[in-house]
Amino acid sequence: MAKKIMVIDDDPIIVKYLVTLFSDNGYETCSASDGVQALEAVKTARPDLITLDLEMPQEWGPRFYRKLSKDAELKKIPVIVISGLAGQHAVKDAVAFIRKPFDLDKLLGIVKKTIG
């Protein structure tokens, strides 16, 4: 069974780009466009990994991450932060912080190292 990656980003172009990248490399994908929608989607989809943008409408990335971290099961899901902001300290337990614009090979390497 393919590993599932959830892409959380408010930019539909980035979402499409990452969903295509991950799908083309054998991963199942799902997405959410803001932190409020994402929390419910994570509970339902139970992804193996999350990519998270920091700056989103309604609820920004670090706040979503704090809520995720309060759930005993959900906090086990590895998170890769992909953001144009220089706020890697805002999600200190993330597997990696990748600054936009990002290198696809680097991102894919981190994903493969993290979930196979």
Positions of predicted regions on the chain:
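Active-site beta3 strand of CheY-like receiver
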Residues: 45-51
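Acidic catalytic/metal-coordinating carboxylates
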Residues: 34-37, 60-64
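Receiver (REC) domain active-site loop signature in two-component systems and cognate sites
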Residues: 56
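Conserved sequence signature across two-component system core domains
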Residues: 8-9, 32, 50
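Two-component/phosphorelay signaling modules centered on CheY-like receiver
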Residues: 12-30
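C-terminal output helix
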Residues: 102-115
